[in-house]
């Protein structure tokens, strides 16, 4: 009977704001830096039921500028799985599309299909995601200009440790 009649709460003096679920805070002070990054282009050791292993064309030291050309894949390792917002500063020709595919793990075991791998060893594994092929991805198309562009989609976040980046142009 007591709970059937609403009463005004006079003890709380703050603002009540609408929310659907838990609050999420953007903590730039906890940003992760890459611990390893490499570009791969070709694959070796592929067999009927194995994708093979990536051939690393070049590696990047921490803090150095990274480049990726058409036909190459840049893999960036942040050292631990996290819920995070990717942030990029890059430059490319007008019309170039940069595709970023976050992943929680790399393919291993020579990309053995029997182990559930979806690509060559050393590439980003995405088959474990709810929408592996079209979901959890960023596509950025460059406009005209010769300046670097900063891209920081702060209204969303992803769970990942690795990021696979490809480009349609230089």
Positions of PLM-derived features:
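Extracellular/oxidizing-compartment recognition motifs
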Residues: 1-170
